[in-house]
């Protein structure tokens, strides 16, 4: 059975990420972000959202593990910042119902959502510049980089929250990540 840990970066929806994976039959565990990387035994990691970069614990070190990583909201932002991209204030700010255009139908994480999907997103901060090796896989009218992927390193990020009911295909994002982690 595929095992995916959800790293708690103190976001308000982290428990929903854990539940979404559990409901898909994934062996999942919610771990605190101060868990030493060498203690993680998993096929994949979800870096949850959270309030700010000052409370990300060991999350940057988890990017060095040789397993797939999905960053959600702050998780995507910290991935971008740690790997050489740039994060800045969003023009929109706050939570909103957003229509996202999928740019890469072959992307293993979100390509199946093409041509577009409606999501619940927060854009107080966002990725402004991609790290080397990443491709922009989704965009919207309020955020230029709604999702990013580096399929060579199995690193994926979404600005939105697939774990909340307002995101129409959120479960599919978690299914796709489960399949990535299982090597399917």
UniProtKB/Swiss-Prot annotation:
CDD domains, A to Z: GATase1_GMP_Synthase
Leading EC class: ligase
GO terms assigned for molecular function: ATP binding; GMP synthase activity
The keyword RNA-binding belongs to this UniProt entry's keyword annotation: no
Tagged with keyword Cell inner membrane: no
UniProt xrefs under Pfam families: GATase (PF00117)
UniProt pathway: Purine metabolism; GMP biosynthesis; GMP from XMP (L-Gln route): step 1/1
NCBIfam families in alphabetical order: guaA_Nterm (TIGR00888), PRK00758.1 (NF001975)
Matches recorded under PANTHER family: GMP SYNTHASE [GLUTAMINE-HYDROLYZING] (PTHR11922:SF2), GMP SYNTHASE-RELATED (PTHR11922)
Description of how the protein assembles with itself and partners: Heterodimer composed of a glutamine amidotransferase subunit (A) and a GMP-binding subunit (B).
The protein's name in its UniProt record: GMP synthase [glutamine-hydrolyzing] subunit A
Source organism (scientific name): Natronomonas pharaonis (strain ATCC 35678 / DSM 2160 / CIP 103997 / JCM 8858 / NBRC 14720 / NCIMB 2260 / Gabara) (Halobacterium pharaonis)
């Amino acid at each position: 059975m595929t095992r995916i840990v959800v790293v708690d970066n103190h976001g308000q929806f982290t428990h929903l990420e854990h539940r979404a994976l559990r409901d898909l039959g994934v062996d999942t565990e919610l771990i605190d972000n101060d868990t030493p990387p060498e203690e993680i035994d998993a096929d994949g990691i979800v870096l949850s959202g959270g309030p700010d970069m000052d409370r990300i614990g060991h999350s940057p070190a988890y990017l060095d593990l040789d397993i797939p990583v999905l960053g959600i909201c702050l998780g995507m932002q910290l991935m971008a910042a740690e790997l050489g991209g740039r994060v800045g204030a969003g023009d929109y700010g706050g939570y909103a119902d957003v229509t996202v255009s999928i740019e890469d139908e072959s992307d293993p994480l979100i390509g199946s959502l093409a041509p577009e999907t409606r999501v619940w997103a927060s854009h107080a901060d966002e990725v402004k510049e991609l790290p080397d090796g990443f491709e922009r896989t989704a965009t919207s009218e309020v955020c230029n980089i709604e999702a990013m992927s580096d399929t060579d390193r199995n690193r994926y990020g979404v600005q939105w929250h697939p774990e909340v009911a307002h995101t129409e295909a959120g479960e599919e994002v978690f299914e796709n990540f489960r399949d990535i982690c299982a090597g399917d």
